[in-house]
Amino acid sequence: MAVANTLISGKINAEVTVVTQSPHYFSGPSRPLLLTKEQTLDRIVRGYEEAIRKGVKVVVGTAFSIDPANRKVRYVGGYTSSGGVGELAYDYLVLAPGVVLDGSGITGYDKYRHNVLNVYDPGRVHLLRSKIWSAERGTIVVYAPKAPYRCAPAPTETALLIDSVLRHRGVRDKFKIVHIDANDKTQPPVIADVVSQIYSRQGIELVTNQEIVEIGEREVVTKSGERYKYDVLAMLEPNRAPKFVEEAGLGKTWIDVRSPQDLRHPKYDDVLAVGDAAGLPFPKNQEIAFESALFAANKILEMEGSSYRASVQYAFVGWAYVGNPEGRLESLSVRFGLDFTSQPPKPSKDPEPKRDYTLAKDNWEQSYLANLFGYS
């Protein structure tokens, strides 16, 4: 939508079509707060109706094939469509398919996928919330795969918000929380020391440099052979671009781009990639996705001879939820930032958890949604 809005603002003489799997958009940054019931779906879901009113053509369907040599995209119609297979021709193709959660490399994943919960989709987060609000005792395992993955702080946010819920219910002493991380430290690294200190105070066990390679009915196994029992498994699978990207020769794990500022594919001037699926040397989060979309739109405007440009640079301030040590359902957050306009990138942080940062994150997300979709 950021690309579409920018192209319309630039008054480009073209039909702008958005192909989306769902007739609604589910915002990501505050999804973890669904666990504590501080957030509700109605505040973070938006439809495309106002975009259509502005002149964007919205096609609800799932893209499954790209033919870059002949400028064709094939898709199967979705919820608000005939449900048939369709084909779109393009002059420019901007790929923003997001990521797929690929557990295919984990033994037992297909058999025990029903045990895998996380905060990344409505069904799984709802079931995870149900379990942590009803269970009386047990072991909760939280897992983060190798970076990069979507929303770097989400696994630590998950662990700390679960901790808050259990404290609120008065049953924290009956649970063990274990965070297994495939990286050498929790993500993002800029606040890893802060998270480690909070984990220590809250009694959350942290295991780093351990990839989960096998899932059983009540146990996970790491690459080194360590076994961890679980009653609840809050696990994020490894992230990658959808398979049709590789099949089209546009990349393997991620979509190939020329540079962060020039998001065209190395082989095709008319194919650009933005968001989490783009092969960028940055964290995968909503702000970087938005900024990459503006760079891509600017490149199309440049190629079309338009003088309009959206103001953009790769830099952001973010907030990571760290729960509430007193068990109140009023989550605190720590603030961090990364400025990629300097090399090496300049990090910043305030290690002191504050309620105001949680409110700032909410205000930012609501403003983002209003600007993107045209209504609050």
Spans of features found by a protein language model:
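Beta1-alpha1 glycine-rich phosphate/pyrophosphate-binding loop at the start
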Residues: 1-57, 146-189
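A Rossmann-like FAD-binding core segment of flavoenzymes
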Residues: 13, 54-80, 88, 164-258
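Residues that mark the start of a beta-strand
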Residues: 15, 139-141, 176, 270
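FAD-binding core/adjacent interface of flavoenzyme oxidoreductases
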Residues: 57-157, 164-170, 234
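FAD-site-proximal beta/loop scaffold in flavoenzymes
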Residues: 111-136, 227-292, 302
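Active-site substrate-recognition segment that forms the wall
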Residues: 147-171, 256, 264-273, 291-299, ...
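C-terminal auxiliary extensions adjacent to catalytic cores
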Residues: 328-376
